[in-house]
Amino acid sequence: MVELYAGKGPSRYKICITDNVLPKNQLNKYIDRKAKVLIVTDSGVPKTYIKNLKQTIRNSSVHIHEIKNGEKAKSFKNYQQILKKLIDLKFSRTDLIVAFGGGVVGDIAGFSASTFLRGIGYIQIPTTLLSQVDSSVGGKTAINVPEGKNLVGAFYNPKLVLISTVYLKTLSEKEYKSGLGEVIKYAFIDNKKLRNLIEKNSQKITQRDNKILKDIIEESIKTKSKIVTKDEKESGIRAILNFGHTFGHAIEARTRYKKLSHGAAITLGMVIASKISFFEGHIKDYQLENIINLIASIGLDTDHSSYKYSELKKYIMNDKKIADGKLNLIMINENYKAFKTDKFDLNNIKKAFKV
């Protein structure tokens, strides 16, 4: 089992990565024996997983709240229902939420924990590749509103993150590829080792080789934990974690979160951002080709031709990275490292959508 850490001071937390079943001792170490526990999960998580988790937690008062699978479930209505459940169960500040599912579950369960009684503890047990490498680490919690994705939320670190590759065996191909989109993101942000791992093991990755999966999850989390520990509230360097997200979120919002998975949308967003980087002179043509080829090598779609700038503009301009009326973009440089800038030619954005 690999143990990593993220956060600072009292909000520092452990991240455990295993290719075996969940370590029972680690889980129960962080749950007070007398505490009530609410497992928030979704309809996509196999019932056997939920049953096994409930049996693993030694507490006598363990409850389950299930939401529907999918991004649309990250709604204000579902958030209210979780709060009502906590109130009905008479939860106190010593009680705990366990987020057991994908990124949607982690976001809404974490946001519920951050706001109920001004904050109760929660544990992340992500069951999708996307949530394992991305949303479970960093303390971002949120719900969606009609005007955009993640516009209502809080930074609130979990007490513990437990990651097992065992859960990835039953993941659909669509969900698996969604997670690979975020893995690719870390390879381009600032992790040459991860980039080399993907280049040399693309076939094993598509075949879900357990050892390679553990390695790419570990490298992805190392990259993210290093960045979020330096910048817990996204006031500086953490913004580079949004590489591809400005355009990916716009695609998701435009299609009402129905057409593409989150990772698939972010993948297209990275292709668009890379093309803008090329037009702005930050990377060479062969580097743009390398980026697109690496993405395609693990079976991810790079064709964004069905999405027009004119259709996405209003969503792009609703982006959280707008400061002082200026849109900040995350681009990539010739060293394959992401950086934030508000200095770019708008025509290069339009051009990137056309090629």
Where are the language model's segments positioned?
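ATP/NTP phosphate-donor binding region
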Residues: 1-96
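Hydrophobic/aromatic beta-strand patches that form the interior of the parallel beta-sheet core
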Residues: 63-65, 98, 123-125, 160-163, ...
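Short glycine/serine/threonine-rich phosphate/pyrophosphate-binding segments
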Residues: 104-111, 132, 249-250
